[in-house]
Swiss-Prot record:
PANTHER family found in the cross-reference section: TR-TYPE G DOMAIN-CONTAINING PROTEIN (PTHR43381:SF5), TRANSLATION INITIATION FACTOR IF-2-RELATED (PTHR43381)
Name of the protein: Translation initiation factor IF-2
Binding, GTP: 431-438, 477-481, 531-534
Cellular component terms per the entry's GO annotation: cytosol
Predominant localisation class: cytoplasm
Biological function: One of the essential components for the initiation of protein synthesis. Protects formylmethionyl-tRNA from spontaneous hydrolysis and promotes its binding to the 30S ribosomal subunits. Also involved in the hydrolysis of GTP during the formation of the 70S ribosomal complex.
Start and end residues of each stretch annotated as G2: 456-460
Keyword Protein biosynthesis: yes
Length: 922
């Protein structure tokens, strides 16, 4: 290793290192000179001597350690509010290590006069601190409070000599403490004699230095003893306070703890539970009655850090009561990480999560960044993400218990000992579109519902109850169109029996299979009605075979499904179908409590211009009466009016009876559970809580979707969007239409439904369409006068539809127009090159003959030589008889040149083509 490499290793300039080597007596003249281990040793010795590392009095090694500790205190102001204040404590300690060889020489020199003089123990007092290194190293141990009395009490000279030679042993072994004032007073004259006797060996400066060192060491040992004692008592107080906190937390979690008693004076809101017990543990001289006597002194006293204060300082330290200022602010850092159990609700902000873990919000944001999420301090996190973050930061995350207003519903939801009575069966009629479901119900009800539906197809759930000679049956008629999957699923959820209508001349179709799956998923028995058996091409046996393939086996083939052949048009075997339904209902033994608060399900909901929100309910248990307070999902309200399916006013509805109610605060979601609550305050509280919870969950999901689909969104610049605002008469209608429109989207064009709702088209809808350049679609609704006027003046397109097919077809046509056209090449002519002219300023001109088709200026051209395409470009100029022409037809000669290409030879063939754009369709 040379000087330059050594300097790089020491991170010093090479010239400075050369100067230091020369000063140390090592002859090095250049940075490339080699450096040996001996040279390094010489340099090290020189540097030690220069910086006080030599022997004698300069042989002392001093180490100064500065410690900075940060704690927190909670301070109560005059208003009773509690604040957290940061407290910083700084300590500086100097440790001195002396040369063991010098100490041994001094000890031997002092041994001779010590043996001769009877009053020699004081030198032991001077000599014991002479080796402070091992004592300092053991200072933090709690067993050393009695070190200083041991040295003072040694009466005989023999222990003194032993103490000097093996200094650490008597320091730790002395068991009995003794007051230090009297021995110090007696030892003073002896020290003077000792100095005279040792004058021949030690000079007076050394003796004085050792005396000062002994006094400093004595004071240090006293401080260490006091620190150790205070630390033990503080630890006991801390554990006691921690146990009290844990007990308080447990009591709060179980909601069983009584509220804390009020403090006798103000500004004591956060007192520990047992301050008197903590003071009583100190000693009998402390009076328990004085725990609150001098409260003003407590408020004026020292601050309490998180690690605790002096043991006799109570909850807040008093002036003059602690041993030293350092003891009050001593902070004991935790030796192991604190693992907290964090209860995470369904949604939580980053700031709240950081507060629960007692960390700064920046730490939580860093952890989320490491997980790939860029968040802010007010970002809402969903429960799953928050638990992952908690576990990532070393704590235990658990989903929070339901401490919500909805817990009231769980408590009140259990039915009591209400009497159970038989209830009518709820029958859902399902099947493929145009298989005759509604016509079959018409025949049963002897009405004409199907003819009133737009296009002859059902687009809503119709709920009716029919009183037959054999009993009451409630029917739910669901749409068969593929767009109404969600509506059919709701029908299956609320039903007891599913009647599957299959046309005998059509067979099993996709919606028939879907209805079977819905019934099986809901665990509902099936009754198959084979309709249209009066048609000539009806084949009931084929229907049975196709249904067996789908897992529906008729009873006559050994299965458990009843098959009934009916004709809605000819009114054939309708009573047989009703008998089959009632037989299945008897097997199910359907019962429900007739008394008590009603419960049910929202079948359909709409916004009526005159009546407001209107919901169709199916009561499942209890009795719904006019004036009841109803809660349905996020909406609530008092039942102002109740109508049956015929539009007649009724005052109450029992189990399995469908009714229309008015008086809700908003249009509820179809499929929501409905229940009656005792008071409006509780209903409003739960509804508002659900609204906020839904909003937070949607926001958290949207944020998660944004993060997950970041890469997917990068390529969406080329995708065309058709913005649509959708308004419908019923909630199920816009659900079905939105589903159907979403299915026709492709990778190039997408339908973007920016707003959908129930009710007429209003002025705000037109303004939204104007701002977002959207198309307004009204399904079975119309625009009001102000909206119509605004739409005409602003040019907003409003489309009205009554049949779902028409709406889907027109939107599909609009999307087809947004597709990028397909480009195709069409060859329009062929040209043969017969002569080539080279003109310096123009380039190569080809004299050609048009053999086929036509040549147009600006058309694309391919140059073919020996049946190989040499060049593809476009015509630059086209002339005939020195005149520029637009086109030259077959069997005529012309002159032409190609753009940016001159390699034309006689005999080449030019193929002329045009690019034609062809419209695409979905």
């Amino acid at each position: 290793m040379n000087v330059e490499q050594f300097a790089q290793e020491l991170k010093l300039p090479p010239q400075l290192l050369l100067e230091q080597l020369k000063a140390a007596g090592v002859s090095k003249n250049d940075v490339v000179d080699p450096v040996t281990e001996a040279d390094k040793a010489h340099l090290l010795d020189y540097l030690r001597k220069m910086h006080g590392g030599g022997g004698g009095e300069t042989g002392k090694t001093k180490i100064t350690i500065t410690r900075k500790q940060t704690g927190e205190i909670r301070k109560t102001d005059s208003t009773g509010k509690s604040r957290t204040i940061q407290v910083e404590v700084r300590k500086s300690r100097t440790y001195v290590k002396r040369d063991p060889a010098a100490l041994a020489a001094e000890a031997l020199a002092a041994a001779e006069p010590a043996a001769a003089a009877p009053a020699a123990p004081p030198p032991a007092l001077e000599e014991v601190p002479a080796e402070p290194a091992p004592i300092e190293a053991q200072a933090p141990v709690a067993e050393t409070p009695a070190a200083e009395p041991a040295v003072v009490e040694a009466p005989a000279p023999e222990p003194a000599v032993t103490a000097e030679v093996t200094a650490p042993a008597p320091v730790e072994a002395a068991p009995e403490p003794a007051p230090a004032a009297k021995p110090e007073g007696e030892a003073a004259p002896v020290k003077k004699t000792t100095r005279i006797k040792k004058a021949s060996i030690l000079n007076e400066a050394e003796v004085k230095a050792r005396e000062d060192e002994a006094r400093r060491h004595q004071a240090l040992l006293e401080r260490q003893a006091a620190d150790a004692k205070a630390r033990i008592e503080r630890e006991a107080l801390r554990k006691q306070a921690e146990a009290a906190r844990e007990a308080a937390k447990l009591a709060e979690a179980q909601k069983a703890a009584a509220p804390a008693p009020a403090a006798p004076t103000e500004k004591t809101l956060h007192k520990p539970d047992k301050p008197a017990a903590a003071k009583g543990a100190k000693g009998p001289d402390k009076k328990p009655a004085g725990a609150w006597k001098d409260d003003a002194a407590r408020r004026r006293g020292g601050l309490k850090t998180r690690g605790g204060a002096a043991p006799d300082a109570g909850w807040r330290g008093r002036k003059g009561k602690s041993k030293s200022g350092q003891e009050e602010t001593t902070f004991v850092a935790p030796t192991e990480p604190i693992v907290r159990e964090v209860l995470v609700p369904e949604t939580i902000t980053v700031a709240e999560l950081a507060h629960k873990m007692s960390v700064k919000a920046a730490e939580v944001i860093k952890a989320l960044m490491k997980l790939g999420s860029m968040v802010t301090i007010n970002q809402v996190l969903d429960q799953e993400t928050a638990i992952i973050v908690v576990e990532e930061m070393g704590h235990i995350g658990k989903p929070a218990a339901l401490d919500t207003p909805e817990a009231f519903l769980i408590e009140t939801g259990e039915p009591g000992e209400a009497e159970m009575v038989a209830r009518p069966p709820v029958v859902t009629v399902m099947g493929h579109v145009d298989h005759g479901k509604t016509s079959l119900l018409d025949t049963i009800r002897r009405t004409r519902v199907a003819s009133g539906e737009a296009g002859g197809i059902t687009q809503h759930i119709g709920a009716y109850h029919v009183e037959t000679e054999k009993g009451v049956i409630t029917f739910l008629d669901t749409p068969g169109h593929e767009a109404f999957t969600a509506m059919r699923a709701r029908g299956a959820k609320a039903t007891d029996i599913v009647v599957l209508v299959v046309a005998a001349d059509d067979g099993v179709m996709p919606q028939t299979i879907e209805a079977i799956h819905h019934a099986k998923a809901a665990g509902v028995p099936l009754v198959v009605a084979v309709n249209k058996i009066d048609k000539p091409d009806a084949n009931p046996e084929r229907i049975r075979q196709e249904l067996v393939a789908q897992g529906v086996t008729p009873e006559e083939w050994g299965g458990d499904t009843q098959f009934v052949e009916v004709s809605a048009k000819a009114n054939t075997n309708i009573n047989g179908l009703l008998d089959a339904i009632l037989l299945q209902a008897e097997v199910l033994e359907l019962q429900a409590p007739a008394d008590g608060p009603a419960k049910g399900i929202v079948i359909e909901a709409r916004l009526d211009k005159g009546k407001g929100p209107v919901a169709t309910l199916l009561v499942q248990s209890g009795t719904l009466r006019r004036g009841d307070m109803v809660l349905a999902g996020q909406v609530y309200g008092r039942v102002r009016a109740m109508l049956d399916e015929a539009g007649k006013t009724v005052t109450e509805a029992g189990p399995s009876i469908p009714v229309e109610i008015q008086g809700l605060s908003d249009v509820p979601q179809a499929g929501e559970d409905m229940m009656v609550l005792p008071d409006e305050r509780k209903a409003r509280e739960i509804a508002l809580f659900r609204q906020g919870k839904y909003r937070d969950v949607q926001l958290a999901k949207k944020q998660a979707a944004k993060l997950e689909s970041m890469f997917d969104q990068m390529g969406q610049g080329e995708v065309q969007h058709l913005p649509i605002i959708l308004k419908a008469d019923m909630q199920g209608s816009y659900e079905g239409l939105a589903h159907a429109l979403g299915k026709i989207s492709t990778d190039e064009v997408k339908v973007n439904i920016i707003h959908s709702g129930v009710g007429a088209i209003t002025e705000s809808d037109v303004n939204l369409a104007l701002a977002s350049k959207a198309v307004l679609i009204g399904f079975n609704v119309r625009a009001d006068a102000s909206a119509r006027k605004l739409a005409e003046s602003s040019g907003v397109d409003i489309r009205y539809y009554n049949i779902i097919y028409e709406a889907v077809d027109e939107v599909k046509a609009a999307l087809s127009g947004m597709l990028a056209p397909e480009k195709k090449e069409s060859v329009i002519g062929t040209v043969e090159v017969r002569q080539v002219f080279v003109i310096s300023k123009v380039g190569t001109i080809a004299g050609c003959y048009v053999t086929d088709g036509v040549v147009k200026r600006g058309a694309g051209v391919r140059l073919i030589r020996n049946n190989v395409v040499i060049h593809q470009g476009e015509l630059d100029s086209l002339k005939r008889f020195k005149d520029d022409v637009k086109e030259v037809k077959a069997n005529f000669e012309c002159g032409l040149s190609l753009k940016n290409f001159n390699d034309i030879q006689e005999g080449d063939i030019l193929e002329v083509f045009e690019v034609v754009e062809v419209a695409r369709s979905l």
